Amino acid sequence: MVQKPLIKQGYSLAEEIANSVSHGIGLVFGIVGLVLLLVQAVDLNASATAITSYSLYGGSMILLFLASTLYHAIPHQRAKMWLKKFDHCAIYLLIAGTYTPFLLVGLDSPLARGLMIVIWSLALLGILFKLTIAHRFKILSLVTYLAMGWLSLVVIYEMAVKLAAGSVTLLAVGGVVYSLGVIFYVCKRIPYNHAIWHGFVLGGSVCHFLAIYLYIGQA
């Protein structure tokens, strides 16, 4: 049986092109960002923990943008079904991956390491949830993404004391940008709402990358 192509799944063809191109740009950004972080780490003789943290962060960013680009670019229904799961699982990995340099390199305290365990545990549970029963509780996924992101408030005092003001500012701005983007994610009636959401994701990712590259990586 020939698989029917799926050009539209709630989005027009033009919207899907915008969706895939927007995160295709993010994919290039993620690759360049990871290279810059690793080159800087080697130049500064960074610890193995720091290099591992940057690798996890950069790898998770690349994975997220790759998954999203493929999901929106490939038009076949069966592939789309699995790529959608891949895309949503990658969000959990990006959240945990972004935390990693801040907690293990920037703070490196018992509280930060404890939060690190919690965040990665939640990410793995989230992936399991996505692969099994997430279709029954769609709104819960969005709530868990936001909740995981703002768990950083647990270490807000340590960040204010130990991290550069620029780093904390960029981290906070990135979180706000991600959160504001959710408005467009849920407003399906807005033309190109998903591409706009992707723009906010890119903006948040750039803020967090700059916080890590300009401050955490040079501390």
UniProtKB/Swiss-Prot annotation:
Domain of life: Bacteria
A GO cellular component annotation in the UniProt record: plasma membrane
Species in which this protein is naturally found: Escherichia coli (strain K12)
Keyword annotations from UniProtKB, A to Z: Cell inner membrane, Cell membrane, Membrane, Transmembrane, Transmembrane helix
Cytoplasmic-facing ranges: 1-23, 75-90, 135-138, 187-195
Gene Ontology biological process terms in this record: regulation of membrane potential
Membrane topology: Multi-pass membrane protein
Listed InterPro entries: AdipoR/HlyIII-related (IPR004254), Hy-lIII (IPR005744)
Protein name as catalogued: UPF0073 inner membrane protein YqfA
Coiled-coil blocks: none
Entries under Pfam families matching the protein: HlyIII
GO MF annotation terms: pore-forming activity
Family: Belongs to the UPF0073 (Hly-III) family.
